[in-house]
């Protein structure tokens, strides 16, 4: 099953997340099909906190991909700010 979820990156105590489309059986930070955005929870100043390609997310959902709870909230906030 294809899912859209967060893959953690960054350093210790400094998380940075990629929003990825992946097979649900793959490891959290493992192989993915497509990167559709990022989320930086520690963004300060002019740093961008969230970038999401909503068109690609909607494409994958139309293809049957499931969305994690956290990513669903990020999609909602991305649509609201756009």
Curated annotation (Swiss-Prot):
Species for this entry: Proteus mirabilis (strain HI4320)
Protein name: Small ribosomal subunit protein bS16
GO cellular component: cytoplasm; small ribosomal subunit
Segment forming the signal sequence: none
Source species, domain of life: Bacteria
GO BP terms in the entry: translation
InterPro entries listed in its UniProt record: Ribosomal_bS16, Ribosomal_bS16_CS, Ribosomal_bS16_dom_sf
Keyword Nucleotidyltransferase found: no
HAMAP family xref list: Ribosomal_bS16
Gene: rpsP
Gene3D superfamilies: 3.30.1320.10
Pfam families: Ribosomal_S16 (PF00886)
Species lineage: Bacteria, Pseudomonadati, Pseudomonadota, Gammaproteobacteria, Enterobacterales
GO terms, molecular function: structural constituent of ribosome
Family: Belongs to the bacterial ribosomal protein bS16 family.
């Amino acid at each position: 099953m294809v899912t859209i979820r967060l893959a953690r990156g960054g350093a210790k105590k400094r998380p940075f997340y990629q929003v990825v489309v992946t097979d649900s059986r793959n490891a959290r930070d493992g192989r993915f099909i497509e990167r559709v955005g990022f989320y930086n929870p520690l963004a300060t100043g002019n740093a961008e906190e969230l970038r999401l390609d909503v068109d690609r997310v909607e494409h994958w959902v139309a293809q049957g991909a499931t969305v994690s709870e956290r990513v669903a909230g990020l999609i909602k906030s991305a649509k609201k700010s756009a």
